[in-house]
């Protein structure tokens, strides 16, 4: 499911060292119909801009 993709992306991002809340906020901004890989890529772009 699409929300499953988002959950998977959030968990991958937390494994990379982001907090659950940072990852959730970034993932929430991304189209949930994308693949897990695409969601992660776009979330990383969002998160890297915040630093």
Give the positions of each predicted feature.
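Strongly charged, low-complexity linkers/loops
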Residues: 1-27
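A general structural motif at alpha-helix termini
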Residues: 27-30, 43
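AAA+ ATPase "lid" subdomain C-terminal helix
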Residues: 32-34
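Amphipathic alpha-helical interaction/assembly segments
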Residues: 36-51
């Amino acid at each position: 499911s699409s929300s499953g993709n988002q959950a998977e992306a959030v968990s991958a991002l937390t494994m990379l060292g982001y907090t659950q809340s940072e990852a959730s906020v970034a993932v929430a901004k991304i189209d949930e119909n994308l693949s897990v890989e695409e969601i992660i890529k776009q979330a990383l772009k969002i998160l890297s801009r915040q630093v």
